[in-house]
Amino acid sequence: MRFAIVVTGPAYGTQQASSAFQFAQALIAEGHELSSVFFYREGVYNANQLTSPASDEFDLVRSWQQLNMQHGVALNICVAAALRRGVVDETEAGRLGLASSNLQTGFTLSGLGALAEASLTCDRVVQF
């Protein structure tokens, strides 16, 4: 079965993103296809490379990145929600005159079209 996940909670402070990541791992372990994860609203904070958890805490941002690198899962973040919350790639940082970007490698700024496409091409879309 082909799945897409929507994450609306931040990397830290709520259980949503952590539960979504565990669900993603379980899907892959059971042989399902996870085509994409779409980060929306507060979920865009999962793509902030400046997040720095304590050394004894789970690093969710880099774990999403590993999921992308190891399994080819697309990590799309809503561009409008990201810009509102200060998560930018190099292109947007330059366009906005910002000194630097903070989008973690492996994540892509995307429009809601990426979510619409996932909902049309996947058997299931699960929101956390």
UniProtKB/Swiss-Prot annotation:
Molecular-function GO terms, alphabetical: sulfur carrier activity; sulfurtransferase activity
Subcellular location: Cytoplasm
GO cellular component, one term: sulfurtransferase complex
Record-stated family: Belongs to the DsrE/TusD family.
Protein name (database record): Sulfurtransferase TusD
Enzyme class: transferase
Subunit structure: Heterohexamer, formed by a dimer of trimers. The hexameric TusBCD complex contains 2 copies each of TusB, TusC and TusD. The TusBCD complex interacts with TusE.
EC number(s) reported in the record: 2.8.1.-
Residues the record marks as active site: C78 (cysteine persulfide intermediate)
Signal sequence region: none
Keywords: Cytoplasm, Transferase, tRNA processing
Pfam families in the record: DsrE
Protein's organism: Escherichia coli O1:K1 / APEC
Described purpose of this protein according to its UniProt entry: Part of a sulfur-relay system required for 2-thiolation of 5-methylaminomethyl-2-thiouridine (mnm(5)s(2)U) at tRNA wobble positions. Accepts sulfur from TusA and transfers it in turn to TusE.
Gene Ontology BP annotations: tRNA wobble position uridine thiolation
